[in-house]
Every structure is written in C-alpha cells, then in structure tokens.
Design a protein with these regions (language model features):
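Membrane-interfacial amphipathic/re-entrant helices at transmembrane-helix boundaries
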Residues: 1-27, 55, 63-68, 140-141
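Membrane-embedded helix boundary and interhelical linker motif in transport proteins
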Residues: 35-90, 133-140, 242, 269
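Alpha-helical transmembrane segments within multi-pass membrane transporters and channels
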Residues: 64-104, 109, 149-152, 255-256, ...
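Helix-loop-helix "hairpin" substructures at the membrane interface of multi-pass membrane proteins
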Residues: 80, 140-225
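Transmembrane helix-bundle core of multi-pass membrane transporters
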Residues: 95, 99, 103-163, 193, ...
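Cytosolic-side transmembrane-helix boundaries in multi-pass membrane proteins
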Residues: 175-182, 186-189, 248-251, 261-313
Length: 313
C-alpha cells in the first residue's frame, strides 16, 4: 500500500521530470556530436555546462535581455570547446586529457564569472525564458513547450549544417580520419569545430537550466557527461531500429534524456536513496556500453560457426 501511495504522487512530478529531461537533452545532443560523430570522448561538458549557466545568469543580473544573454552563453561554451580542440590538435594532448584540463580550468573561471559559488535569479524581477514555477501551466511559456521548440530549432540547424560540405567533412573526420586526410580534408580544423559546436550546445543547455531552476552553481555540471551518455545510449537502445534519419537520431537522444529523468523520478518516488543516484547512473551507463561488446563476444561467434559448419557440409 505504501508503494501505491507513493506512485500516486508520480503524475504530479512528471511535468518537472519531462522539462528537466528536455533541457538536459540539448546537452546530450552536444555529447552525441562528439561521442558518435567525432568519436571523441570529451569531458569538457562538465565544465562548459556550468559556464553556460554562469554567463547567462550574470548577463541577466547585469540587465541584459534574455534573448541577448543566451547567445553570449552559447559563445562562451563555444570558446571552451575551442580551447579543448586546440589543446588536442595544436598541442598534441590526448582528447580525454585535454577535456579534463579544460574542465579543471573552467571551475576557477566559473567561480570568477559569478564571484562566488552560486548566483540566484528571481523570476519576478527578471524576464526569464523558462521557470520551474510555470511547469504545470498550460501556456506558451510552459518550460516543456519552450524547450521542445528550442530542441526542434537545434535539431533543424544541425540537420542542415551536417548536410553541408563542412558538416560532411566533420562526419568523415570522425568516421575515418586517415581517409579524410587523404582526401585533403583538414581533420584538425574539423575536430576543433566539432568540439566547439558540441560545447556551444552544452552551454545553451546550462543557460536554460539556470533559468529553469532560478540559480547557477559552480558544480551544476558535475556528472553531466554521464547523463549525456545515458541519454545517448537509452535513445539508441529504444529507437535505433526505427530511427535511421540523422534528425530522428538527434531527436532520439532528447527523448532518451526524458526517459532517463522519468526513471530517476520514479526511483526517487519509490524511496530510493538520493545519495546513490550517481552510482545508479554510472552503473546503467556502464551496462549499456558493455552490451555491444557482450553481443559481439557471446552471441556472434555461434552464428559464424553455424554458417561455417553449413558450408563444410
């Protein structure tokens, strides 16, 4: 009976979970660009997510319009990806280590931007684009509606961009760097550009989350890479058989983030210890990452052996 009583509270919490999932889904799309397209494990996102939130909040507190604050936050995120890309390509530092170095530096930079560990912003005093307060309202300014529109714009722009010659060059760089260089493609430039675009999206997500929750925190991006990977993997696991178009693959990542946050909300509603959420997330990501390896190791060989036996017969 206690479980049923707790589950009765779940519908009231679902709008908030969906809104958060959509916001983090934009960040997950950024992770998808580096993880699946560039084939680079970029850990900058844990820092650039907070940078987007910090820059957006400080711009709003200084009197800047929200429509001007968001592009500034996006440019700040783009700059963080640019730094990681240059550390990797120009200085020869491995991509993972380059991301860690940038992430570490961004902790101090985010502190310097805000002047302290966190900065709050009041929805009554500032014209925010989204807010937690409106999540259950049936109106255009509902965060769910606004972020769906933002996600649609992001997916549309990325679909167009990766269909251009430059975008195809980035995809080719991630798919086969050696062949791309042989075709005269500047792979270093494409890696830097891909990382910059990815972290620009991550910063946009951070800027939206800071408005939604009403504050920016220096540690708000901690564990973002795990959430991003979880969204990518869940989206692929659920929709990979039916979503083959590039735009639909990006949409599946966003839906994966929503599923992730709904599951998290369900687990919390059932009384799971909130202190163990990061452990749960890491375990889920580890298992899903291992599934392709397990499939190849334990399920492919018997099929090949059966085919060989049939040929010999």
């Amino acid at each position: 009976m206690e479980i049923i009583a707790r589950l009765a509270n779940l519908p009231g919490a679902l709008p908030g979970a969906c809104a958060q999932g959509l916001i983090w889904g934009i960040m997950a799309i950024g992770v998808y660009l580096t993880y699946r397209i560039l084939d680079v494990a970029d850990l900058t996102v844990d820092g650039s997510f907070g940078t987007g939130g910090a820059v957006c909040v400080m711009c709003l507190l200084s009197g800047m319009n929200v429509w001007a604050a968001l592009p500034v936050a996006v440019l700040a995120g783009l700059a963080t990806g640019l730094v990681t890309g240059l550390l990797h390509t120009f200085m020869g530092i491995p991509a993972i280590l380059a991301g860690i170095l940038t992430q570490l530096a961004l902790y101090s930079i985010n502190l310097k931007i805000m002047g302290k560990a966190n900065q709050s912003i009041n929805v009554d005093k500032y014209g925010l684009l989204i807010s937690l307060r409106w999540v259950k309202e049936f109106a255009l300014h509902n965060p769910i509606i606004m972020v769906i529109l933002a996600t649609a714009v992001v997916i549309g722009v990325l679909y167009w961009f990766f269909g251009t010659e430059l975008g195809c060059g980035i995809r080719a760089t991630g798919s086969n760097p050696a062949m791309s260089r042989a075709q005269g493609i500047n792979t270093n430039f494409n890696i830097v550009l891909g990382l910059a675009v990815s972290n620009a999206l991550v910063a946009l997500s951070g800027a939206l989350l800071s408005q939604y929750q009403g504050f920016a925190d220096v540690g708000m991006g901690r564990g973002a890479i795990v959430i991003g990977l979880a969204a990518v993997i869940i989206g692929e696991a659920v929709f990979s058989r039916i979503f083959h178009n590039f735009a639909l693959k990006l949409a599946s990542v966003s839906i994966g983030a929503i599923i992730y946050y709904i599951v998290i909300q369900l687990v919390l509603t059932l009384g799971f210890d909130a202190n163990l959420l990061k452990l749960l997330s890491a375990s889920v990501v580890a298992v899903f990452l291992a599934v392709p390896y397990w499939k190849g190791k334990y399920f492919s060989k018997p099929v090949k052996k059966a085919k060989e036996d049939a040929k010999n017969a």
